[in-house]
Design a protein with these regions (language model features):
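Short, Lys/Arg-enriched, disordered terminal segments
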Residues: 1-2, 298
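ABC transporter nucleotide-binding domains
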Residues: 2-7, 12-203, 208-209
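Residues that cap or initiate secondary-structure elements
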Residues: 18, 31, 55, 229-231, ...
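Generic alpha-helical secondary structure signal
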Residues: 73, 111-114, 167, 214, ...
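Short loop/turn segments at beta->alpha junctions
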Residues: 93, 212, 280-283
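ABC transporter nucleotide-binding domain
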Residues: 167-258, 278
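C-terminal coupling/interaction segments
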Residues: 249, 255-299
């Protein structure tokens, strides 16, 4: 499968701060790929390198088969880019902005432009400086989708937006997902879970993992064991058991390598036969909270 974005051992240092520490990503064409992690994890730094806004200290990055250091001019006609704090010409109206941008993109679709203006309820004659944060984001996204980009790059697009606006933006993206690769950074896990196909978790510049969201959801389970008498935390247990605790006759933990056959067998090998075993699916937020609290790399 061809990659829309590929990075290899990407490092970025700002004086004494190492914002990225050997980041390697493979973003397949057609994916809705989410780069997630806490604030300060390095997500925006990675995107700025991909968009040739800043240079990497070392390593390499390619976007649509082109080295990111070469992304400029006509290459930008295939990329839609929207960032959280994107600068826009405040004196322009929404209509003037679209009129200004249209000639720069040979693939600009006026029918799609009209459709996006209607879908996002954009006020054509209102100046950008007078728009709410959510409406500004809609205007930025509409101007980045109207030319059918092969790649859509979004840096924290949902920050500070009310739920209705977030839903409208997500729907606008999903309506075009079949023709574009979408690469989005966010710390809003609840939103990401609703539409991403792939996910990568970045923490302090380190990539903790990268995989399909369905695979991640399948391998994480909250486990609860009930015994006939008081239970204790064993000294030795599989490395994939995170946040293990015992209270009275109940043991709880998260298994980050859940397998319907192996996990019960491992439990019996460590504890003997419990009176009851339950395995519950986890939300994306619960998965990342567990990982952060565990402080392990076993995931």
């Amino acid at each position: 499968m061809t990659n829309a974005i590929q990075t290899e051992d990407l490092v970025k240092k700002f004086r004494r701060v190492e914002a990225l520490r050997g980041l390697t990503l493979d973003v397949p064409e057609g994916a809705v790929y989410a780069l997630v992690g806490p604030n300060g994890a390095g997500k925006t730094t990675a995107i700025k390198i991909l968009m040739n806004i800043i240079s990497a200290t070392s390593g390499r990055a390619a976007v649509l088969g082109v080295e990111s250091s070469q992304i400029r001019g006509h290459y930008l006609q295939s990329i839609g880019y929207v960032s959280e704090n994107q600068q826009m010409p405040e004196w322009m109206t929404v209509g003037a902005l679209l009129n200004y941008l249209r000639p720069f993109y040979p693939t600009w679709d006026t029918n799609l432009e009209a459709e996006l203006k209607k879908q996002f309820d954009l006020p054509r004659d209102r100046k950008l400086r007078h728009l709410s944060r959510g409406m500004r984001m809609k205007a930025a996204l509409a101007s980045s989708l109207a030319y059918h980009p092969k790649l859509i790059v979004l840096d924290e697009p949902f920050t500070g937006l009310d739920p209705l606006v977030r839903d409208e933006l997500i729907q606008g993206l999903l309506d075009r997902a079949e023709e574009s690769t979408i690469f989005v950074s966010s710390h809003d896990l609840a939103e990401i879970e609703t539409f991403a196909s792939h996910i990568a978790y970045l923490e302090e510049g380190n990539l903790k993992f990268e995989e399909e969201l369905s695979s991640l959801a399948n391998r994480f389970r909250e486990v609860e064991l009930t015994f006939d008498s008081a239970a204790t935390v064993p000294q030795n247990q599989p490395a994939s058991w995170l946040q293990l605790s015992a209270a009275a006759a109940v043991v709880r933990f998260t298994d980050c390598r859940f397998d319907a056959e192996r996990t019960p067998a491992d439990i019996r090998g460590v504890f003997g036969e419990p009176r009851n075993m339950t395995f519950s699916p986890m939300s994306l937020r619960s998965i990342f909270l567990t990982m952060a609290k565990s402080g392990r790399n076993s995931a």
